[in-house]
Amino acid sequence: MNTRKFKLSDEKKRSTQRRVVRSWLIEHPELNPYKFTWDRFYRKITSRFRMLPSFLIIGGSRSGTTSLFAHLIEHPNIIPGSMKEVYFFQYFTNNKTSFYRSHFPIKRKNLITCESTSNYFVHPLIPARVHKLLPSVKLIVVLRNPVERAYSEFQKKVNLGEQITENFEDDIKSELKRIEIGNKKPELKIGNTNYDQFSFSHLRHGLYAQHLEKWLKFFPKEQLLILHAKDLYDNLDNIIAETFEFLNLPKYQIESRIEKNKIDKIRPLGGHERNIYKNIDSKTRTLFNVQNYPEMKSETRKFLQDFFRPYNEKLFEMIGRRFDWNDEK
């Protein structure tokens, strides 16, 4: 019997119970009608005693990172922060490190924490920012067929009312024009981080080899784990085991199973973990309620497969592994 494992589980349970009580007091309509909380202030003044992430899930968007995060934090050695996506390296780098630390748990022996912000992978300045603060951090990337990912992201934007056009083909044409302009006038990219990571860059977000190159300039391959999104559904147990091994964590059999990223099948933990699940759940429902969208036109799929093929081949060469993206229908 592994007594160390049970000790860690008990410690995590006690920590969770404290958060449940604190959450109950904060949300009680009579004891605290205005939901006043010292939580942020407390986190700030105790930031020096808090962990920094041991690993980051940096992308890609619409590729299963929410599912992966929810599975991983079931491990008794992993305590999540106050939120899944902190966006520190994207928007808040002018803030002090204490601000970033304030989002994570108090340091505890044999316990680690993490962050999962899928926009990190495509932002050109983030690799250097992460390396400066977390040079030894481990990085996890989940990659999905870029054709499917682009269509899924487009439909998500349509569902949220954020798309200028609801015609996928028109959207592709517009982005191809922007790519052409950027190639002809590279000076437009100088100091313009939005060029590469702009939220409507459905195609550019799928040029994985280009994004990966930027990360490999700062981090060795040994600190990077690349997962195939399809395996999260077809081969979940092995993927989770591989990830725990990559993180140097003891083996652990997760209890939850997620199909099509429906978080309601996860066993909630309570306290701020419960709030994280609520946040993931509402976000996931919003994003994945668009699964009834029409199928992509066959000619559009063929065009995108041809567009992404050379970038996919470069990626496969970089990682020494092939996915069946070029032939999927």
Residue ranges of each PLM-predicted region?
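PAPS-dependent sulfotransferase catalytic domain
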Residues: 94-106, 163-256, 306
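Short aromatic-enriched loop/helix-cap "lid" or pocket-rim segments at secondary-structure transitions
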Residues: 126-127, 150-155, 161-162, 238-240, ...
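Short glycine/proline-rich turn/loop motifs
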Residues: 47-49, 187-198, 285-300
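The conserved 3'-phosphoadenosine-5'-phosphosulfate
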Residues: 2, 6-19, 213-309, 313, ...
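Short histidine/acidic/glycine/proline-rich micro-motifs that form metal-
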Residues: 87-89, 117-121, 201-202, 229-233, ...
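Extended catalytic core of nucleotide-activated donor transferases of GT-like folds
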Residues: 120-125, 315
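Non-transmembrane alpha-helical segments in soluble domains
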Residues: 69-73, 90, 101, 131, ...
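PAPS-dependent sulfotransferase catalytic core
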Residues: 1-121, 132-185, 190-192
